[in-house]
């Protein structure tokens, strides 16, 4: 497997970002682009000492590095990308491992993977996450809550939100289970909550004759078997590179039996339908309610989407999705293209500006998360 210079690796990252087919099969049909996807495969795994689970759960993260700051940051080298995409796995018994990865590119024939190698904080402010009129919608009634796409949103026992992305897998934000130094309290016994009717008769008690009242719901919990967190988050906590990797995957102990939403590579903001994104989460100012919102993307970098969707702590970890045309299957399909991370106050031309931020699923992140889910890179060739 021949190595290539680091400059060529940077060129590959750029090609992954822009080297795609035209996103429109017709002016009124925004279409999922086709990307040339890399492969991220484990190279070696070593055991680590058990963590102390001493961190306090953070329902949001903040950063002073805004769009212009991030745009001025150089793309990672091959060695840096390998370091950031290496990951820790935490198991239900408290043990953990660290896995180093290699980055590959599929050969044009599709018969195998070619290795690509090389030669070698802000001012504190009160956080405001509601912009003008509160445009969030609380979702009521089992006919909505238990149906797609709202049924893909789940609650973490640490207080965040997650999204079902496979039969046994939940995508969420890394800061919901790890503060960048160690795992948060309760992560060893992490559970995922699924909304279901509180009563078997359809949502109301036997003595409740008020048909206009919404059905009462409760959470049914499933334990988590293991979690994956990228080292880019763990090693990046001292600076703003960590926010680019604020995502984690949870594997449940048993299948959830609900329809899930697939992940996809995030298209450029200008190719999103209406330039908008959507997500649903369990904002902590509306306890027990699933809250849906949509809004325009205001800015973007290679790794982040900046928007002003109304949100509160607790919504962190929500899957950011869009609905676009799938040319191969000739149908519309929603996909998760990012993970809602948190809130930022940044300096914009000398004036403070606040944003809510989502981590984009880039081609490399897609390859990593897909491998965590599938365990076979050949099943991860369509982003």
Swiss-Prot record:
Top-level taxon in the UniProt lineage: Eukaryota
Ranges where the record places region Disordered: 108-127
Disulphide-bonded residues: 160-176
Annotated glycosylation sites: 93, 207
Signal sequence coordinates: 1-19
Principal location listed in the UniProt entry: secreted
Phosphoserine: residues carrying this PTM: 109
Keywords: Disulfide bond, Glycoprotein, Hydrolase, Phosphoprotein, Protease, Secreted, Serine protease, Signal
Catalytic residue positions: 175, 240, 316
EC code: 3.4.21.-
Any GO molecular function: serine-type endopeptidase activity
GO CC term, one of those recorded: extracellular region
Localisation: Secreted
One Pfam family matching this protein: Trypsin
BP GO terms, sorted: proteolysis
PROSITE patterns, per the entry: TRYPSIN_HIS
Gene3D superfamilies (UniProt xref): Trypsin-like serine proteases
Keyword Repeat annotated: no
Family listed: Belongs to the peptidase S1 family.
Name of the molecule in the record: Serine protease 23
Source organism of the structure: Macaca mulatta (Rhesus macaque)
Organism lineage string: Eukaryota, Metazoa, Chordata, Craniata, Vertebrata
Gene coding for it: PRSS23
